[in-house]
């Protein structure tokens, strides 16, 4: 049981070489996220809490929004570290962030100031781990990325209290891709 509030984070899009919504890797990632979230929802998950980073965090929001018709009580929160989060992004990415923030049930900045110092990022991570019951990361320690810091923070919280940390690793993604390919092959054989 992951509890009622789940923090979802992981790799940035560029770390996975996913560039665009039609990338086949994205379908695998979203399928894996969907399957895991549905399992947690069936166990009593109420809130998905994530940030707005380009990559797993935004994809998790997209997947969660797609699950809301099946789980009408499911809530989504997008918390960003500071008020001007994403301002350095190109116009399309800023628009995507704004659109997602407009669709979730709750969105706010942890620090009510523009970016000033790295301590705001540490404060954000501390806030998220304190206000969630478990973490789900699309992350593999054998393939480090920026989510390494989130993984370390989640593991540190797990050392202090009951805080399950579940990873979707590269092997898990490979298994999902194989299952999807097998299902597609069966579909074509039955036609």
Curated annotation (Swiss-Prot):
Q: Hey, which family's this protein in?
A: Belongs to the UPF0398 family.
A Pfam match is YpsA
Q: What is this protein called?
A: UPF0398 protein LSEI_1479
Q: Which cysteines are joined by disulfide bonds?
A: none
Q: Which Gene3D superfamilies match?
A: 3.40.50.450
The protein's superkingdom reads Bacteria
């Amino acid at each position: 049981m992951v509890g009622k509030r789940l923090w979802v984070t992981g790799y940035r899009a560029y770390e996975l070489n996913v560039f665009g919504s039609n990338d086949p890797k994205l379908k695998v990632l979203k399928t894996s996220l969907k399957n895991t979230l549905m399992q947690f929802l069936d166990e009593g998950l109420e809130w998905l809490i994530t940030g707005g980073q380009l990559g797993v965090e935004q994809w998790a929001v997209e997947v969660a929004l797609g699950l809301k018709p099946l789980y009408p009580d499911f809530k989504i929160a997008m918390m960003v570290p500071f008020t001007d989060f994403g301002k350095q992004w190109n116009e399309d990415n800023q628009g995507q962030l704004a659109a997602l923030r407009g669709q979730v049930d709750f969105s706010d900045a942890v620090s009510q100031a523009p970016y000033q110092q790295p301590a705001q990022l540490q404060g954000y991570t501390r806030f998220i781990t304190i206000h969630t019951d478990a973490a789900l990361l699309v992350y593999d320690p054998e393939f480090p990325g920026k989510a390494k810091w989130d993984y370390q923070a989640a593991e540190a919280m797990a050392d202090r209290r009951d805080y399950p940390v579940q990873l979707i690793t590269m092997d898990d993604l490979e298994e999902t891709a194989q299952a999807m390919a097998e299902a597609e092959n069966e579909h074509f054989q039955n036609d």
